[in-house]
Amino acid sequence: MPRIVNPLDEMLFKEVLKEQQRIRVYIEKARYGKLKTIIEGIDEKEFDLEDIAKKLKAKLACGGTVKKGRIELQGDHREKVKKLLADLGFSEDLIEIE
């Protein structure tokens, strides 16, 4: 990341980064046939995945974690996650649901 001195410039830089993130949302089977929603493609160097996961878990009333640079949420929340990520400033056009 380029060195940014002005806090306003840093905020604008983060907003531009959010709009350029290609995010993939898909389902994986967990133990005992349960489903989990996987969100990957958010740059963990630029964004606090723990904070994003915390906000998503609160809005979706589900459990989850951050592992290997991706967010894992318990249950199938694909469509809801797309809207919530868009509300957080990520471009809805670049969120791919599988």
UniProtKB/Swiss-Prot annotation:
<dbReference type="GO" id="GO:0003743">
    <property type="term" value="F:translation initiation factor activity"/>
</dbReference>
<keyword id="KW-0648">Protein biosynthesis</keyword>
<keyword id="KW-0810">Translation regulation</keyword>
<dbReference type="InterPro" id="IPR005872">
    <property type="entry name" value="SUI1_arc_bac"/>
</dbReference>
<dbReference type="GO" id="GO:0001731">
    <property type="term" value="P:formation of translation preinitiation complex"/>
</dbReference>
<dbReference type="InterPro" id="IPR036877">
    <property type="entry name" value="SUI1_dom_sf"/>
</dbReference>
<dbReference type="GO" id="GO:0006417">
    <property type="term" value="P:regulation of translation"/>
</dbReference>
<protein>
    <recommendedName>
        <fullName>Protein translation factor SUI1 homolog</fullName>
    </recommendedName>
</protein>
<dbReference type="Pfam" id="PF01253">
    <property type="entry name" value="SUI1"/>
</dbReference>
<dbReference type="InterPro" id="IPR022851">
    <property type="entry name" value="SUI1_arc"/>
</dbReference>
<dbReference type="InterPro" id="IPR050318">
    <property type="entry name" value="DENR/SUI1_TIF"/>
</dbReference>
<dbReference type="GO" id="GO:0003729">
    <property type="term" value="F:mRNA binding"/>
</dbReference>
<comment type="similarity">
    <text>Belongs to the SUI1 family.</text>
</comment>
<dbReference type="InterPro" id="IPR001950">
    <property type="entry name" value="SUI1"/>
</dbReference>
<dbReference type="GO" id="GO:0002188">
    <property type="term" value="P:translation reinitiation"/>
</dbReference>
